[in-house]
Amino acid sequence: MELRQLEYFCAIVETGSVSGAARKLNMSQPPLSYQLKQLESELCVMLFSRTGKGCELTEAGRLLYERARSLLDYARSTRLEVTETGKKRVLRLG
């Protein structure tokens, strides 16, 4: 499971469809669908139940979304903190 896959998964949840997520992520739908299938395969669960009106999260999907959102937020804040720390200059005396 990669952060990129979690970003894709969250985008699908937040836009309500694979096609909407593909537009939001500026990518085509087939690679996004492929990554979703890879994630489901790796986790051995269905994350969405496909209905005539689109996709609905399964119980496993809801749990993953909660955890993925937290992980992505944490990764983003960590990246910002590390970047800011790297920008600080150290003044050495002596």
Give residue spans per PLM region.
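Interdomain hinge and pocket-entrance segments immediately C-terminal to HTH DNA-binding domains
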Residues: T83-G94
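Short helix-boundary/capping micro-motifs
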Residues: I12-S28
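A short LG(V/I)-centered, amphipathic sequence patch enriched
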Residues: E40-L57
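Helix-turn-helix DNA-binding elements, focusing on the entry/boundary residues of the two helices
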Residues: S17-V18, L36, R50
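Core residues of bacterial helix-turn-helix
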Residues: K24-L25, L36, L43, L64
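Short alpha-helical "packing" element that flanks the helix-turn-helix/winged-helix DNA-binding module
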Residues: Y8-I12, L64
